[in-house]
C-alpha cells in the first residue's frame, strides 16, 4: 500500500480486555505491522458513569502482556492527541457548531418519555423504530419555549433524504444502506457529550486513520460515520468488519456464557502463556495458507493477509486453545513453567508460601514430570493430586492388576530394595527396578504396572522412576507397606 497505514484499537474503560476486543486489537496490530504502519490505542471514555477505575490501566496492562506494542497512545503522543475522547472537546465543539450553522444538525428537545412512546407506537405498528423528525424544523419561538420549560436539547444530525451509502468492506465485500431507513440521529447527548458515532468519525479523521478493522456488530454504525465524513467533505477510511466469535454450540460468545472464560486476565491468572493466546486468538476468524497452526508473533506479522479474514463465524474451541497452549508449554524451560505454576501450588497449600530452595527443587522435578501434558500452568494442581493426598480408592482395573500371582513376591522384593537405597534419585531407582526384574524374572507390563498402581493408585502417568523420586522414599515405602 502506498499511503501510510494507520489503524486504531479504541477500547472503552467501562470493562476489561475480553476475547473479542483482544482479537480486534490483535488484527489491527498485525495489519499495521505487516505494512510497517502505526498501531494507535485510543481511549473512548465519554461514558463517565460506567467507567471503571482500573478499566484503562487494565486494558494497557493486558495488551502489553499479550505482546501488542502500540506506537501511539496516552503515553506516546505523536502529535495526534489527546488520545482520550474525554479530553478532545476542543476538537468536537467547533465541528458541532459548524453543523448547526450549516443546518446539517439541529437541536431536539423531546424528552426520553416522548421518544420512548414514539418507539413503542412504531413497534406496535410493526415498523422499524426510528426518530420521526418532530423537532427537525422548530421555529426560534418554539425553541425558546422549550428552553423556558427547562428542557435540555440533544443535537441530531439531519440525515440526507433518498441517499444510498455504500462502502467496500475488506471482509464482507460491498455493503449498502438507504438513508431513509435511518432516522435523524443524536450526535450530542443532553449532557453535552458527543455520541460514539460522531466522536469516532471525527477522531479517525484527525488521527489520519487509514483503515478501521472492527467487529461485525459495528456494520450498522458505518453509514452514520460515512454521513459525518460527507458532511465535512472528508475522505472516509477503508472499513473491515470481522466475523462473530461463537461458542461450541454456535451461539454468539457472550459475557454471560459460563462455559468459556471471557477475559484475558482470567487466562493470565490460570497460567496460560501470552504467546499461546496471541496465536490462538489470531486463528479466530483468520487463517494462514497451509496446515501449520503454530507461529511466532514475527511470523504472523510477515504472513498476515487481510484477504484471508473469514466471513464465517469463528468458533471458540476450548480444546484447541488447550492444545495450542500445550505446544508452547512443551518448548519452555522447566524453570519458566515452575515460576508460572508456583502461585497455584502455594494457593493449593501444596508448597509453602515462602518455599525454601529444597521446596523449589522438588517443585521443578514435579513440573518436569507433567510439563509435556500441561495445558496451562495451573493445571499442575489437579494433575499432581497423587503427590499430596492419600492413596485413592482403587478401581476395578487397578485392583485386578494387584491380584496377579506374582505381585506379593514383586512387592516384597521392591520394598526391600527401595528401603536400602541410599540415593533416592530417578537414575538409581531405574537401576533398582532392573535389578528386581533380573532377580524375580518378572518383566514388561507385569513388572511395571503393579509397581505404578501400588505407589500411585493409577495405571498411567509420567516416567515411573521419576514419579517414585518425586513421591519421596517415606511416602513410597508407606504405600508399599500398606499394600503388603
UniProtKB/Swiss-Prot annotation:
One of its GO terms (biological process) is glutamyl-tRNA aminoacylation. SUPFAM superfamilies: An anticodon-binding domain of class I aminoacyl-tRNA synthetases (SSF48163), Nucleotidylyl transferase (SSF52374). Its EC number is 6.1.1.17. The keyword Protein biosynthesis applies. ATP binds at residue 255. Its main location: cytoplasm. One of its GO terms (cellular component) is cytosol. A motif ('HIGH' region) lies at residues 11-21. A motif ('KMSKS' region) lies at residues 252-256. It catalyses: tRNA(Glu) + L-glutamate + ATP = L-glutamyl-tRNA(Glu) + AMP + diphosphate. PROSITE patterns: AA_TRNA_LIGASE_I. Keywords: Aminoacyl-tRNA synthetase, ATP-binding, Cytoplasm, Ligase, Nucleotide-binding, Protein biosynthesis. GO terms for molecular function: ATP binding; glutamate-tRNA ligase activity; tRNA binding; zinc ion binding. It is found in: Cytoplasm. Monomer. Catalyzes the attachment of glutamate to tRNA(Glu) in a two-step reaction: glutamate is first activated by ATP to form Glu-AMP and then transferred to the acceptor end of tRNA(Glu). Belongs to the class-I aminoacyl-tRNA synthetase family. Glutamate--tRNA ligase type 1 subfamily. This is Glutamate--tRNA ligase. The gene is gltX.
